[in-house]
């Protein structure tokens, strides 16, 4: 199996919980209908998945060509490149859906990115704790 059941559950639970949090928070904070923020969240999540596949394909190709090791510096460049590229695509989406200027969308998108970093840390910690309690031990190869 190309993608394990465990990875599918992890990815889907991560995205669904994040989508619910973002849709409700944006709807409440900006007084925008939940249908708008929910749709925006879904479109951004799908965009992120596709961008992830495209970006990583070309990044790994570049890595192989230049025989780069995954040092901290390379990982930081990867993260900045991924998030920066994603923001270039999502900022116009946010501006349109939320009926705001590009500058406001940049600020909102950056804020969302920072919140998602915190969410990712908390989600992963909780997920690992649950797996540990269920007796799952990850194999590292």
Curated annotation (Swiss-Prot):
Induction: Induced by chlorhexidine. The chain crosses the membrane at residues 16-36, 39-59, 76-96, 103-123. The keyword Membrane applies. It is found in: Cell inner membrane. GO terms for molecular function: antiporter activity. It holds the Pfam family BTP. Disruption phenotype: Deletion mutant shows increased chlorhexidine susceptibility. It is a multi-pass membrane protein. The keyword Magnesium does not apply. GO terms for cellular component: plasma membrane. Keywords: Antiport, Cell inner membrane, Cell membrane, Membrane, Stress response, Transmembrane, Transmembrane helix, Transport. Mediates the efflux of short-chain diamines when energized by an electrochemical gradient. Involved in resistance to the synthetic biocide chlorhexidine, a widely used antiseptic and disinfectant in both hospital and community settings. Interacts directly with chlorhexidine and mediates its efflux via an energy-dependent mechanism. NCBIfam families: AceI_fam_PACE, PACE_transport. Belongs to the proteobacterial antimicrobial compound efflux (PACE) (TC 2.A.117) family. This is Short-chain diamines transporter. It comes from Acinetobacter baylyi (strain ATCC 33305 / BD413 / ADP1).
């Amino acid at each position: 199996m190309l993608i394990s059941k465990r990875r599918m559950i992890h990815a889907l639970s991560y995205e669904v919980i994040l989508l619910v949090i973002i849709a409700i928070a944006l709807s409440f904070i900006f007084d925008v209908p939940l249908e708008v923020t929910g749709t925006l969240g879904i479109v951004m999540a799908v965009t992120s998945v596709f961008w992830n596949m495209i970006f990583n394909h070309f990044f790994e190709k570049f890595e192989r060509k230049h025989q780069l090791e995954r040092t901290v510096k390379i990982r930081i460049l990867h993260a900045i490149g991924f998030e920066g590229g994603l923001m270039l695509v999502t900022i116009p989406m946010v501006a349109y859906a939320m009926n705001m200027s590009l500058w406001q969308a940049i600020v909102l998108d950056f804020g969302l990115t920072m919140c998602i970093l915190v969410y990712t840390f908390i989600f992963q910690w909780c997920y690992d704790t649950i797996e540990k309690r269920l007796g799952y031990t990850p194999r590292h190869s």
